[in-house]
């Protein structure tokens, strides 16, 4: 990969300063050579306008098998990237294969199915808030562990018929492990093996005992002679929708609460009714997207960037959503600030084009229910530690917080 006399910017593998690093990358240009963990090079795209363009450009693929020489030479196998680009589902499919797989999964995320979950999301939210209310007044509690994480986890597991108990805890642990971009090949391999064992067991159970859940729907689609997907595509699709279906919502909730508690003037606006909760959700998605960067895409042909470098055929591209969300060239001088009254709410947190996240309406619905309910129950909610002591989830992919200690004062 060549760029005019410039060494690649080395991405922090532990993501200790996601937004500081995003600002530094933006200062280097709309597309910058970067080095990811393991010495993998990719063009980090930080410009909102350029990223939006590339997300719909036919010269950009998500299929490493067809369009990435490093994968074709078997130089990536076993790395932390394996679970991100080594899968065979909508996430890595290109062209006709992507359309086929998206058509199969789309019925699982219709507006009707999402709307049907609303009463259940409300009930789960109420139960979790009741549990929090039993916590000793004024004592710190980790909101991520007790509310932000269990809500979307329970919702997605019920949608897909995932059994209660230890298996759900194991699923959560494995998804967190996949997000770890510091994993060794041995750790990545162990995580992948455990994930597929868990999902294979779920598929076997639904074949034997089909039910009114989305796993059963996908199993039926896979076994239908007219709409076949391979068994590996089925497992990888489940990994995509179950993993993405809860982890991103966990961080959406956490980032929204964190933003409001560190911007009390904004919290006052929404609690007074001057600004709707929908605006809080969209500004959170722009200001602190759950996915800070998402590996990888690949140039199918040379792509000349106006007033910038040329991304050569076969080179990797890293969409940098955290950087694009705060791009001052698109959002103006106040791009780095959290402002729920912002005129321009557009963001790319759920992607764009044919790879736009199918689960976006579900994530928004969960946040629309959970956030006002949380602040209605605990209007005096406050951080239990200084904001600067909050630690990121870890890795450069996730844009969330490892924990969110709060005090649940009622007024």
Question: Locations of the language-model features?
Answer:
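Cytochrome P450
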Residues: 1-411
